[in-house]
Amino acid sequence: MSDLKKAAQQAISLMDLTTLNDDDTDQKVIELCHKAKTPAGDTAAICIYPRFIPIARKTLNEIGGDDIKIATVTNFPHGNDDIAIAVLETRAAVAYGADEVDVVFPYRALMEGNETVGFELVKACKEACGEDTILKVIIESGVLADPALIRKASELSIDAGADFIKTSTGKVAVNATLEAAEIMMTVISEKNPKVGFKPAGGVKDAAAAAEFLGVAARLLGDDWATPATFRFGASSLLTNLLHTLELADAPQGAQGY
């Protein structure tokens, strides 16, 4: 198997297959669940809005997808600085049955010089998750832009108890970049290599996935990237990876997240 095919195979096993669109429906989420069981193996998770968790759980149970995790989003997508609302949303997501919660860090507050609210919001949301629900923190690196701010948001999130740090919501102009990945995984290597990393949005094909996995291997070791420590947040990426593995036709037309 070529290096590119190996990267494609690995990336599928690390994928949070995502639909976070305003026009999402039960039927679209059911279809997403079926897509997550790919000819090359299951994706690590699906990522959906909280209201679709019950239908996703039912569908995954029916199709033998019990091992596919259900991730959802809170404080999404704007990263507001109201801790109480973020906590209520996170508690509700856990009550709905989310295995993982991707919460948006109050990145605008950090850009205005407020480091405290981000730390406290992540800490409170981690407490709301309890012991069994994974918390991923979206720092919106494409808006932070400044390497010092990307580093600071990563440090604050890890210090507050994040299980993963994630680049992006996929709802802004600049999403996952190798530059942000380098900074964020450097912080992970310095602080706690058990914390995971999730590039989201903009990873379009096996070659791009391989580049992100290469940064992970260089900074954290060849065997570091597993579903417990690395995820790709993506939608269109899956079809491209299956095409690389010669298990699907080339994608047609416009592609999303």
Curated annotation (Swiss-Prot):
Chief location: cytoplasm
Chemical reaction(s) catalysed: 2-deoxy-D-ribose 5-phosphate = D-glyceraldehyde 3-phosphate + acetaldehyde
Domain of life: Bacteria
NCBIfam families: deoC (TIGR00126)
Pfam families: DeoC
Recorded GO CC terms: cytoplasm
A biological process from GO: deoxyribonucleotide catabolic process
Pathway stated in the Swiss-Prot or TrEMBL entry: Carbohydrate degradation; 2-deoxy-D-ribose 1-phosphate degradation; D-glyceraldehyde 3-phosphate and acetaldehyde from 2-deoxy-alpha-D-ribose 1-phosphate: step 2/2
Family, as annotated: Belongs to the DeoC/FbaB aldolase family. DeoC type 2 subfamily.
Protein's name according to its UniProt entry: Deoxyribose-phosphate aldolase
Broad class of enzyme this protein falls into: lyase
This protein's record includes keyword Cytoplasm: yes
Compartments it resides in: Cytoplasm
InterPro entries per record: Aldolase_TIM, DeoC, DeoC/FbaB/LacD_aldolase, DeoC_typeII
Active site (catalytic residues): 102, 166, 198
E.C. no: 4.1.2.4
GO-annotated molecular function: deoxyribose-phosphate aldolase activity
SMART domains noted in UniProt: DeoC
Functional description taken from the UniProt entry: Catalyzes a reversible aldol reaction between acetaldehyde and D-glyceraldehyde 3-phosphate to generate 2-deoxy-D-ribose 5-phosphate.
Record Gene3D superfamilies: Aldolase class I (3.20.20.70)
Keywords from the UniProt entry: Cytoplasm, Lyase, Schiff base
